[in-house]
């Protein structure tokens, strides 16, 4: 048991590092994108990325998850048949869909973009999509075989190549969106080439139609949930382009990318580490007490990071896009989008209650409903309110998700959350932001320092208002006493391997 837990932790950590590198490329390249691309170019890039993700999700048929579900280490020969069958089916479906699209690519360029002048982008898009479908299946096979180091090698190789070719095509060759997509094509194709030897050792040339039918029956319903989640997060891109233009979409996408730091570094990292623990302990006597504390602490972290991102968003956007003032308006969207991410984190925790009681159909209903709600609200308010309306819609829909999940979770897995503390976090965070927004509006060194003082003072403000419990203050004191000595850093890191009993320790 302990060996399995250690193995799981090891692979999870390695996968986290690999996945994080793929998220970083867009952030690292932001200064180049904003200096070399117009807002319209950046809008086109965001539009094509969204389109690509939707099509890849549909063509994948949920089979990357199906591979992990149906392949077992008990019968490796059968696993090889399944893997060959899945790859063959994925290639066939991709060709069946993409060949007609390629034939009618001129018409597609009129539908998606601005006609023949963007035909090269459509061509690149139609080549990238099947490569990404194959890559997603390949990475699932690597995870199945627990080759985590090879997984990271491929992901980091892709990241490095994409980064270098982006710089080459954009800075050296003066290319724009076409250069970015060409970089993606080269890096995706390279990953496939690097993984051919591995795949050849994990396949046998035997097609298994009966197993394929079972896998599709299992995996296909997952598509609707995934598409609904994507529609909730991304459908506003299409509506902004339809009602306004690519230029406004570019400004909006920069705001989304910047606020998305919270999702990448806090929410996704938390999900990766928390989920195995939650499923392991949810039936234990003190589990609910643990979960309520986690809700409070996650909300604290989300509000602190959202406040930090919001307070310094104006300075950061101006710094990143200093050569292109057309992007600067993006900072106005960031506080609302950050608040949406706070509720995204909260609704995630609340939604887990449906997993504990095996009522996951409720999750599917909530996601589909909120995706439809987001689309409906955007259709109504984007035209009069512009991109700020899209940001408001995103925030509101995550808030609605949290409310719905709260009522369902209280019905099936009741917990007494610390709402007084959570409300205090929201009120203090919002008031500090409003003070900064209206009093420290100008961008100068003095205001920057005052904002920094506000952030440093925030934990102290919470202390004055009685947010912390006695045991928490004691733990903070112990933590500081232990970690302030740099010489003990290695021992302290090793000591983080806490027992399950520590996680569930009474907070009274």
PLM feature spans:
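Helix-terminus/linker motif at the lipid-water interface of multi-pass membrane proteins
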Residues: 27-41, 109-112, 230-261, 265, ...
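Interfacial segments at transmembrane-helix termini and the short loops linking adjacent helices
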Residues: 5, 105-125, 310-340
């Amino acid at each position: 048991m302990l060996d399995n837990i250690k193995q799981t932790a090891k692979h999870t950590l390695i996968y986290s590092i690999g996945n994080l590198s793929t998220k970083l490329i867009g952030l690292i390249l932001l200064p180049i994108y904003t200096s070399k691309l117009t807002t319209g170019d950046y809008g086109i890039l965001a539009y094509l990325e969204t389109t690509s993700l939707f099509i890849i999700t549909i063509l994948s048929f949920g089979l990357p998850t199906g591979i992990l579900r149906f392949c077992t280490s008990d019968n490796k020969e059968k696993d090889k048949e399944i893997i060959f069958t899945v790859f063959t089916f994925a290639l066939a479906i991709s060709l069946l869909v993409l060949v007609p699209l390629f034939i009618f690519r001129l018409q597609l360029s009129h539908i998606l973009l601005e006609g023949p002048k963007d035909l090269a982008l459509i061509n690149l898009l139609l080549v990238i999509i099947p490569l990404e479908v194959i890559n997603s299946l390949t990475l699932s096979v690597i995870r199945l075989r627990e080759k985590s180091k090879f997984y990271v090698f491929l992901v980091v190789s892709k990241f490095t190549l994409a980064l270098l070719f982006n710089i080459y095509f954009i800075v050296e060759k003066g290319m724009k969106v076409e250069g970015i997509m060409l970089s993606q094509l080269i890096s995706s194709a390279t990953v496939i080439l690097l993984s051919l030897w591995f795949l050849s050792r994990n396949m046998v040339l035997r097609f298994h139609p009966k197993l394929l039918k079972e896998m599709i029956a299992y995996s296909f319903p997952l598509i609707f949930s995934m598409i609904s989640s994507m529609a909730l997060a991304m459908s506003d891109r299409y509506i902004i382009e339809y009602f306004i233009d690519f230029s406004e979409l570019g400004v909006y996408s920069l705001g989304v990318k910047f606020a998305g730091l919270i999702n990448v570094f806090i929410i996704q990292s938390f999900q990766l580490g928390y989920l195995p623990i939650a499923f392991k302990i949810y039936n234990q006597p003190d589990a609910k007490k643990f979960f309520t504390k986690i809700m409070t602490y996650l909300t604290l972290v989300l509000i602190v990071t959202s406040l930090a991102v919001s307070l310094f968003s104006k300075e950061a956007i101006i710094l990143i896009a200093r050569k292109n003032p057309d992007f600067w308006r993006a900072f106005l969207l960031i506080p609302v989008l950050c608040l949406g991410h706070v509720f995204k984190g909260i609704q995630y925790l609340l939604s887990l209650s449906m997993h504990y009681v095996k009522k996951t159909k409720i999750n599917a209903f909530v996601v589909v409903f909120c995706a439809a709600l987001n689309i409906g609200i955007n259709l109504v308010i984007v035209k009069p309110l512009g991109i700020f309306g899209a940001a408001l819609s995103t925030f509101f829909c995550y808030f609605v998700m949290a409310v719905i999940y709260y009522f369902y979770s209280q019905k099936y897995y009741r917990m007494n959350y610390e709402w007084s503390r959570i409300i205090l976090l929201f009120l203090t965070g919002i008031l500090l932001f409003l003070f900064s927004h209206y009093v420290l509006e100008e961008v100068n060194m003095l205001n920057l320092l005052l904002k920094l003082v506000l952030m440093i003072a925030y934990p102290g403000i919470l202390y004055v208002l009685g947010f912390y419990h006695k045991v928490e203050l004691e733990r903070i004191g112990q933590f500081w006493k232990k970690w302030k000595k740099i010489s003990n850093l290695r021992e302290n890191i090793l000591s983080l391997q806490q027992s399950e009993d520590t996680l569930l320790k009474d907070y009274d």
